């Protein structure tokens, strides 16, 4: 398994196409993302990921961006396969405090989770600060988890296959909390027949106002 790190430079445009360089290629502006309207996610680019032919490989790898100058996570990119999936229970991640971590309870439940960009069930990463962002329960469970499960179930059913998987946190300006993430996936051996998606998942919590610049929150 190859595990790598690459530098990340953030601007107003937050989609990185070439994960082997520091160049950023914009497909949409964060300001063009429509406001949350009741659905946990929207599709991007007709649900087709932005991978190119050079990305398709059957070699396993994991790549995580360095934290930027504000301490924020960048693109996380992997070729998910049985080889890199965890073989033991998830470890403790409570020592990691991602940017914007201003935890509060509402109705007896914590607002924020430490959200894996590449889910633990896919790559076995525990307290990797390059892979954890501040996200709401709704974002984590209702938004990201169904897509993670789709990839995990495909690999479980096809243990010799691979899924290219990239998660890009989308920050507006210098905000410390991401507005959401772009999730892209493509099953390599069957050329996307069983897994192929490109979605933006909203980092919101119904009934709660979030100040994305700081992580502070309040009831609506």
Regions from the PLM with identified roles:
Residues 1-7:
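Hydrophobic membrane-insertion alpha-helices, especially the h-region
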Residues 51-220:
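Domain-level detector of nuclease and nuclease-like folds
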Residues 9-60:
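N-terminal, intrinsically disordered, polar/charged segments of Gram-positive cell-envelope systems
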